[in-house]
C-alpha cells in the first residue's frame, strides 16, 4: 500500500503564482537535482514548508493546506484500488471537527459505466454532451449523471484499464479517438492503467516507483521521462493512434511559459 498527500498552494494573485513559480526556478538554477546535497534539501524545504506545515492555511479546515490524501492498495488480490480522502466536517459536538474521510475519486466515473454494456450509454451521453470541454481537457466529471451516481468511490486498476463507450463523437479538431483519450487519460484508472502505461513494456501502475533501491534515483515511468520510439498503444476498441508522453518536459515547459508571460499578459488573456 502507498499513500500520497496532495497539498493546495494558496497563491491568490497573479504575482503570488509567479513568485511561487520563480522559487522553483531558483531551486533548479542553484543546485543539481542529484545527488541531493544538504544545500539542495534545505532550499527545497524552504519552498515546501510554508505549504505543508501545520497552520499553513488559517482559513481552511484544521488550518491545513491538504487538498486530498490518496491511497493505492492491492491487499488480497486484483484489482489494484485507489481511494481518495478529504478533510470533512463532523457533526457539532464531535471531539474533532474536521477529519479525513473517504471521498469520490475525482475525474473518474465508476468502472461499471465502461465495463457494463447496459451502462455504457450513460458514459457515452456524458462524453458527447461535453465534447468541447473534453477536447480542450477542461471538463469536470460530476458526481451524478442522468439521475444516477456517476463518480467512483474508488478507482480500480487492471493493466489495460481505460474508459470507452460505443458512439463517442468527435468535435472540432478532436477526432473520436482524441475525445476518448482525453477523457480516459484524465481519470485515475486510465492515467495509471492502459492510457499512459504499456503493460508489454512498463511496470504496472506506478509513475514514481516506491521500491527503487536506496541511494539511487527513483524509478520513473515512461509517461514522465518520455516514451521515445515506443508510444503507448490505444487500449480501447477504437484502436486509435499510439500516444507519446514526456510529462516532466511538459511541466518544465509550462513553468518556463508561465515565468515568461507576466501578470499583465495573463490578465488580458483571462
Give the location of each predicted region.
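Secretory pathway export signals and precursors
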Residues: 10, 131, 170, 184-187
Amino acid at each position: 500500500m502507498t499513500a500520497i498527500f496532495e497539498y493546495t498552494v494558496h497563491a491568490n494573485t497573479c504575482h503570488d503564482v509567479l513568485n511561487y513559480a520563480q522559487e522553483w526556478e531558483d531551486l533548479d538554477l542553484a543546485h543539481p537535482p542529484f545527488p541531493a546535497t544538504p544545500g539542495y534539501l534545505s532550499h527545497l524545504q524552504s519552498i515546501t514548508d510554508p505549504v505543508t506545515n501545520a497552520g499553513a492555511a488559517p482559513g481552511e479546515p484544521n488550518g491545513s493546506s491538504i487538498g486530498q490524501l490518496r491511497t493505492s492498495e492491492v491487499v488480497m488480490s486484483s484489482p489494484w484500488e485507489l481511494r481518495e480522502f478529504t478533510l470533512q466536517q463532523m457533526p457539532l459536538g464531535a471531539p474533532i471537527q474536521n477529519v479525513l474521510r473517504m471521498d469520490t475519486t475525482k475525474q473518474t466515473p465508476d468502472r461499471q459505466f465502461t465495463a457494463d454494456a447496459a451502462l455504457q450509454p450513460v458514459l457515452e451521453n456524458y462524453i458527447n454532451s461535453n465534447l468541447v470541454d473534453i477536447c480542450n481537457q477542461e471538463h469536470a466529471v460530476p458526481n451524478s449523471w442522468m439521475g444516477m451516481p456517476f463518480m467512483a468511490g474508488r478507482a480500480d486498476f487492471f493493466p489495460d484499464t481505460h474508459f470507452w463507450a460505443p458512439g463517442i463523437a468527435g468535435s472540432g479538431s478532436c477526432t473520436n479517438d482524441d475525445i476518448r483519450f482525453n477523457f480516459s487519460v484524465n481519470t485515475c484508472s486510465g492515467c495509471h492503467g492502459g492510457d499512459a502505461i504499456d503493460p508489454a513494456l512498463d511496470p504496472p501502475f506506478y509513475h514514481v516507483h516506491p521500491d527503487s533501491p536506496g541511494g539511487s534515483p527513483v524509478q520513473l515511468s515512461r509517461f514522465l521521462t518520455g516514451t521515445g520510439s515506443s508510444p503507448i498503444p490505444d487500449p480501447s476498441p477504437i484502436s486509435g493512434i499510439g500516444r507519446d508522453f514526456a510529462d516532466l518536459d511538459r511541466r518544465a515547459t509550462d513553468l518556463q511559459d508561465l515565468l515568461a508571460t507576466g501578470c499583465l499578459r495573463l490578465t488580458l488573456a483571462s
